[in-house]
Amino acid sequence: SDAIEVTIPSFEGEMGILKDHIPLITFLRPGIISIKNQDEKNFFAEEGTVEFSNNNLLILSSTVKDLKNFDKNSISGALKDAEKKLQETNLSDKEQYITSYKINSLKEISQ
């Protein structure tokens, strides 16, 4: 069935997309994608691209995990990897920014 609303984490902030939303292309930052229809499904996504046009939503991301299948050990491992990456001295500002968002999102999920 069609989604009533999809909320995505974009670099502009949390963005809610409803039917007949204006066309858009934006960049996805690490965070929670929420899809609402009769129930609600939540996914953790890493960076990517979002396009909405003619009531079709396309999300391209290297990693998307269903939160109901994302166990504490997986979250903990991903969090440790991200924190370790943030300690690297050769990261670009963009990589630091994205990794920080990833860490914050993973901490939010783990609670």
Sequence positions of predicted segments:
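Compact, glycine-rich, soluble single-domain proteins
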Residues: S1-D81
